[in-house]
Amino acid sequence: GEALNGEVYNKLLQNTGLAMHEGYGQSESTVIVGNFGDMEVKPGSMGKPAPCYDVDIVDVNGNSCPAGETGELVIRVDKEHPYGLFAGYYKDVSLTAEAFDSGVYHTGDTVYMDDDGYIWFVGRKDDIIKSAGYRISPFEVESVLQQHPAVMECAVTGVEDKKRGQAVKATIVLS
């Protein structure tokens, strides 16, 4: 699945009157973060951590990030391995060791938490476009493009560029 863009959420709400309760999980887990029960939904956010997971957002050095700072979403497993999180990759010890490092499971997804404890998806660690020294998240560019009334859908990718390393390419379906 893909992260739910705030603009898509608002269009659904406007057209149907229904609030969508987004959740985030991986093939390796159950729902890690979500808009559960009667909690207020913040359009575009993934929600708050599920109580069964010890979720943290860490920088490249493994330090917890303050609210508003982007880092990698991890699950701490040093005290207890939560039910619903896989034990490892089948017959792939090295990939398992990479995913479970120093008592944490690395999701590979970058996020930030706001002051209210809601988590917002930024992108994949391996999905970043590097152009002229800048690190660009395709999801962030897609979110901005999606706000334009003439854009129905879009996808952003990096393409080879001799001067910049990569250039940002947007494929757009017009309304």
Language-model segment annotations:
Residues 58-59, 67, 107, 113, ...:
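Hydrophobic alpha-helical segments, especially N-terminal targeting/anchoring helices
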Residues 17, 52, 150-153:
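Glycine-centered tight turns that cap/initiate beta-strands
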Residues 25, 77, 81, 95, ...:
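AMP-binding/adenylate-forming catalytic core of the ANL superfamily
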Residues 59-61, 70, 115-116, 150:
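Residue-level recognition of short loop/turn positions
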Residues 44-49, 99-103:
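Short Gly/Pro-enriched turn/cap motifs at secondary-structure boundaries
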Residues 1-42, 54, 61-64:
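Gly/Ser/Thr-rich phosphate-binding loop
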Residues 10, 44, 94, 143:
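Active-site phosphate/pyrophosphate- and oxyanion-stabilizing loops and adjacent acidic/basic residues
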Residues 49-52, 63-98, 136:
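Conserved ATP/PPi-binding loop(s) of AMP-dependent carboxylate-activating enzymes
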